[in-house]
């Protein structure tokens, strides 16, 4: 006996619902794949408290990291108004308050929900190193004031501390090579690769109070006190680095002036590094207050000196050489000056900060040969002050010192570090590397991100849009078939 019409329809609907439901289940289980959600962006703030000024740098990186170190980019550079924090010896509280403006500017760029998650650090360099030598109590008061202001700010304040000269040099080296892509590069195949060691670039930094040289030598570093070791992007690095305190631009100028006073004490000081026709009055006392000056003012001199420029580059170089102790390295192969060990130079070098600012003014950043650099600086030093002053309006603050700074840099690089006519082309004078301002701060943040745990990216079950639509359609068909079968069973009268 055959099935009735009602039974045929009921079984057909029931079968359709089963097929549709099974198809939807297969699509749900088979086509689903693991999909990583977009990773969050994290932020970090570093204050560079230098001897002449303080700068804030805001960095950002993805929460997931490449080989244990975050890929960091610069989001903001802000120069704090006023002098360096070491200048606030008579009003320590003002040192902390001076940081507020740049900090508020940085917080505008960070989502409010991440303010408290943003690591913030202040590193003080040679200016505070000198103040700590001169008056440790004043240095502690300034650090306390800075810590109080940043500690109550809506950030994750990690602390304020004195950065060692060796660390300053090493982190500057990291910044240069990160910006140039010589630490890690993103290949055309979509993979992160490590370039060969020969591509690494040395770093030459000069602040107001110290100067640093850092590079990877061709052999072992014999003086381990000049070696810095760290790990980035899954690779280990050992670099030679040394910081020369009191050899920064501002301290060099002060020492140079004191040396001239000591050699010829008189109420009228003729300065060979100042352009001819320049004249000014300087207070004698403050010149001798720096820990870099190891002399006492001659008793016969008045409190104020009249200083007159003579524009004599030969005499200027002779006075600058007196700031170095070259004789301490006689008979030693691996020695720079002042008896400091230095292995042979190797590879390309980036010279930044005051190296760059001075040579940029003198239009010497186009890799000119050493002979051209020397001739250009000497020619500038022999120009009359009135002519130079008229050619560069509004630059009176630094204008008188470019002759001395240029000849000092030339002496330091050529006679101190040992860049010859042949190796001079390996020098590049730069402010940025790969679109990033060069300094120790980015290198520090790159190293710091190695200590910040990477958030594991969230995984979800997901499928393509077409599969999702098909799954919904089959589920709807299954539901319609089940409802239809139920209605047939309940309301269809028997044949």
Curated annotation (Swiss-Prot):
Residues on Extracellular side: 30-471
Signal sequence, start to end: none
Family annotation (Pfam families): GDA1_CD39
Alphabetic keyword roster: ATP-binding, Calcium, Cell membrane, Disulfide bond, Glycoprotein, Hydrolase, Magnesium, Membrane, Metal-binding, Nucleotide-binding, Transmembrane, Transmembrane helix
Cofactor binding: number and manner: Ca(2+) or Mg(2+). Has lower efficiency with Mg(2+).
Regions of this protein lying in the Cytoplasmic compartment: 1-8, 493-495
Top-level EC class as recorded in UniProt: hydrolase
Reaction it catalyzes: a ribonucleoside 5'-triphosphate + 2 H2O = a ribonucleoside 5'-phosphate + 2 phosphate + 2 H(+)
Single annotated GO MF: ribonucleoside triphosphate phosphatase activity
Entry-linked Gene3D superfamilies: 3.30.420.40, Exopolyphosphatase. Domain 2 (3.30.420.150)
Name used for this protein in its record: Ectonucleoside triphosphate diphosphohydrolase 8
Organism (species): Homo sapiens
Gene: ENTPD8
């Amino acid at each position: 006996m055959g099935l009735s019409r009602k039974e045929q329809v009921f079984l057909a609907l029931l079968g359709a619902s089963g097929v549709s439901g099974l198809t939807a289940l297969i699509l749900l289980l088979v086509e689903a794949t693991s999909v990583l959600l977009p990773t969050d962006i994290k932020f970090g703030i570093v204050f560079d408290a230098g001897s002449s000024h303080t700068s804030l740098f805001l960095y950002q990186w993805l929460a997931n990291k490449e080989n244990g170190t975050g890929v960091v980019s610069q989001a903001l550079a802000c120069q704090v108004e006023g002098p360096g924090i070491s200048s606030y010896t008579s009003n320590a509280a003002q040192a902390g308050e001076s940081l507020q403006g740049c900090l508020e500017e940085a917080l505008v760029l960070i989502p409010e929900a991440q303010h408290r998650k943003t690591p913030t650090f202040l590193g003080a360099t040679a200016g505070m190193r000198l103040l700590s030598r001169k008056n440790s109590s004043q240095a502690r008061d300034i650090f306390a004031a800075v810590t109080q202001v940043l500690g109550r700010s809506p950030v994750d304040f990690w602390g304020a501390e004195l950065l060692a000269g060796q660390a300053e040099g090493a982190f500057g080296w990291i910044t240069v090579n990160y910006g140039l892509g010589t630490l890690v590069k993103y290949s055309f195949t979509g993979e992160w690769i490590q370039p060969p060691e020969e591509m690494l670039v040395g770093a030459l930094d000069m602040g107001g109070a110290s100067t640093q040289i850092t590079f990877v030598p061709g052999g072992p570093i014999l003086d381990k006190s000049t070696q810095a070791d760290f790990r980035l992007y899954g690779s280990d690095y050992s670099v030679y680095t040394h910081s020369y305190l009191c050899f920064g631009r501002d301290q060099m100028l002060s020492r140079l002036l004191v040396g001239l006073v000591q050699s010829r004490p008189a109420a009228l000081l003729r300065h060979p590094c100042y352009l001819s026709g320049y004249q000014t009055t300087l207070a004698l006392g403050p010149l001798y207050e720096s820990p870099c000056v190891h002399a006492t003012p001659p008793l016969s001199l008045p409190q104020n000196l009249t200083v007159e420029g003579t524009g004599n580059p030969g005499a200027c170089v002779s006075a600058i050489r007196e700031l170095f102790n070259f004789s301490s390295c006689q008979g030693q192969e691996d020695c720079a000056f002042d008896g400091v060990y230095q292995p042979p130079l190797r590879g390309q070098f980036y010279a930044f900060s005051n190296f760059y600012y001075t040579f940029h003014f003198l239009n010497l950043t186009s890799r000119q040969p050493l002979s051209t650099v020397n001739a250009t600086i000497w020619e500038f030093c022999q120009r009359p002050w009135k002519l130079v002053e008229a050619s560069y309006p509004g630059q009176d603050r630094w204008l008188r010192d470019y002759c001395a700074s240029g000849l000092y840099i030339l002496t330091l690089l050529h006679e101190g570090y040992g860049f010859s006519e042949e190796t001079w082309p390996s020098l590049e004078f730069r402010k940025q590397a790969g679109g990033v301002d060069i300094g120790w701060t980015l290198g520090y943040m790159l190293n710091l991100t190695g200590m910040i745990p990477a958030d594991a990216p969230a995984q979800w079950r997901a499928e393509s849009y077409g599969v999702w639509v098909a799954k919904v359609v089959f589920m709807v068909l299954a539901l319609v078939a089940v409802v239809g079968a139920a209605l047939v069973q309940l309301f269809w009268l028997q044949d």
